[in-house]
Design a protein with these regions (language model features):
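Sec-dependent bacterial lipoprotein signal peptides
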Residues: 1-18
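Ser/Thr-rich, Pro/Gly/Ala-heavy low-complexity intrinsically disordered linkers and tails
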Residues: 20-106
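Disulfide-rich extracellular modules and peptides
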Residues: 22, 32, 37-38, 44, ...
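Enriched but not universal
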Residues: 77-79, 86-91, 429-442
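Glycine-centric low-complexity/flexibility signal
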Residues: 94-152, 172-175, 181-417
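Beta-strand repeat architectures
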Residues: 143-146, 163-172, 436
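Small-residue (G/S/T/A) turn/hinge positions that recur once per unit in extracellular repeat modules
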Residues: 163-165, 186-188, 299, 339-340, ...
Length: 442
């Protein structure tokens, strides 16, 4: 990924050799939220902008001291029953509430985990891509497989620093079970993209009717794939010249999700034209963060769905993947201004056309990480049509792909699920959840 600097109209003053001179402000160009620094999103004009109005940043633990989270955590209300006493004496604070679908009495916490730079963790291999970013934490030695196939990491504490991120990948969902306090100032991301499967993102076969179906083939113009469903329904795939678009993935019954740890469903592939149809976007993964003490979030915890691929010549665009699951539970939950907990759907891919030199449709955007706005569908090539937007914010359903005389656009993926649970909760007005979610008691 390369960032380009572009000059903006604003002017700031710089002091050079004792003299005050004017210099242009700069902003980073972007194609999506992942291209921007923390606490910024990809805004109008494809430039990185602040996600929320600036607010005082909470104190951050000092790097290089894993295991000191209880002392460095800037939580408030230590005299209000925060079960963090005794950490210095080798005791693990017990949970004063029952975390969802977790038998915490069977888990023994290991050392604290500190994420100090950008890396990823694979629930299949149980390894960090860059072990140095995890400050020497041996996840493979402490990981536990739960009865539902979830990989759990029992921890004494957790810190994700503001200039660090942890991408969560692999076939199995992940549960971070913290017997103590946790601070997330950087990013925890279980989302999917065209290159990465988020941890626990299910296969088409696992999703059943909640997966988008494939568009019909037609060398004169194929149908787009349907968007994946999860908390809501995906978008319809757009029709091609004489080919129907794929059906959207259905919303899952929320009653069946009360304790399950599972991700969002994939979009259907676009039908084949003269060229191939676009691939369906993967659904977001499943992340469960349970903290016995105080959890303070000023960064990002997310599980967006992946965007659908653009169709080849006269091929249909792929449907976007649905957002996944972000379940956060704590004794005391604090969401600071600038915090973002998101599970947005991916945009559908654009349809292809064989009349233009650039015959491929564009890929749909992945679900937004730090905003409640819809991921854009990919543009269609030439006379072909674009994909539908992903579900986000108060619009949880994916938008339908457009019909076309060439390749139809893929439907957008639905939004996923955010769960916030706390014995006590502090949610700042500048904190964001998408889809919108309120904190509830256990």
């Amino acid at each position: 990924m390369q960032w380009q600097l572009q000059a903006l109209a604003g002017i700031t003053s710089l002091v050079v050799a004792g003299a005050c001179v004017e210099a242009p402000e700069v902003s980073l160009s972007c194609q999506g939220d992942r291209d921007c620094p923390q606490h910024q999103v990809c805004g109008e004009g494809s430039l990185c902008v602040d996600a929320v109005p600036a607010s005082p940043a909470p104190a951050e633990p000092v790097k290089g001291t894993p295991g000191d989270e209880g002392e460095a955590d800037p939580s408030e209300g230590e005299g209000e029953g925060d079960p963090s006493e005794g950490e210095g004496e080798g005791e693990s604070p017990a949970f004063d509430f029952p975390p969802t679908n977790l038998e915490v009495d069977t888990l023994v916490p290991a050392a604290s985990l500190s994420i100090v730079c950008d890396t990823s963790f694979d629930t299949g291999t149980r390894l960090f891509a860059d072990p140095s970013c995890a400050a020497g934490f041996d996840a493979a030695a402490v990981a536990v497989e739960l009865p539902d196939g979830t990989v759990a990491l029992p921890l004494a504490g957790l810190t994700v620093f503001s200039d660090a991120s942890l991408a969560l990948t692999g076939r199995a969902p992940l549960a971070l079970v913290v017997f103590g306090n946790a601070t997330v100032a950087g990013a925890l991301d279980a989302g999917s993209s065209s290159q990465v499967r988020g941890a626990g993102a299910p296969d088409l076969a696992e999703c059943g009717a909640s997966a988008g179906t494939r568009g019909e083939n037609d060398d004169g113009g194929a149908g787009g794939g349907g968007g994946g469903g999860f908390a809501d329904q995906g978008g319809d795939g757009g029709d091609g010249e004489q080919a129907a678009g794929g059906s959207p993935g259905a919303a899952l019954a929320t009653a069946g999700l009360a304790a399950a740890r599972r991700g969002g469903c994939s979009g259907g592939g676009g039908g084949d034209g003269d060229g191939g149809g676009g691939a369906g976007g993967l659904g977001g993964g499943a992340l469960h963060l349970a903290v016995s003490g105080t959890l303070e979030v000023s960064g990002v915890i997310s599980s967006p769905g992946g965007g659908g691929g653009g169709g080849g010549a006269d091929g249909g665009g792929g449907g976007g993947g649905a957002g996944g699951l972000v379940r956060v539970e704590a004794g005391h939950l604090i969401l600071r201004n600038g915090a973002a907990l998101t599970a947005n759907g991916g945009g559908g891919g654009g349809g292809g056309d064989d009349f233009c030199l650039g015959s491929d449709g564009e890929d749909g955007d992945d679900g937004r990480l730090r905003a409640a706005t819809r991921a854009a569908g990919g543009a269609g090539a030439c006379l072909a049509t674009g994909g539908g937007a992903g579900g986000a914010g108060g619009n949880g359903a994916g938008a339908s792909g457009d019909d076309s005389g060439q390749g139809g656009g893929g439907g957008g993926g639905a939004a996923g699920i955010i769960e916030l649970v706390g014995l006590s909760c502090e949610v700042a007005p500048g904190a964001l959840t998408s889809p919108p979610t309120s904190c509830r008691a256990p």
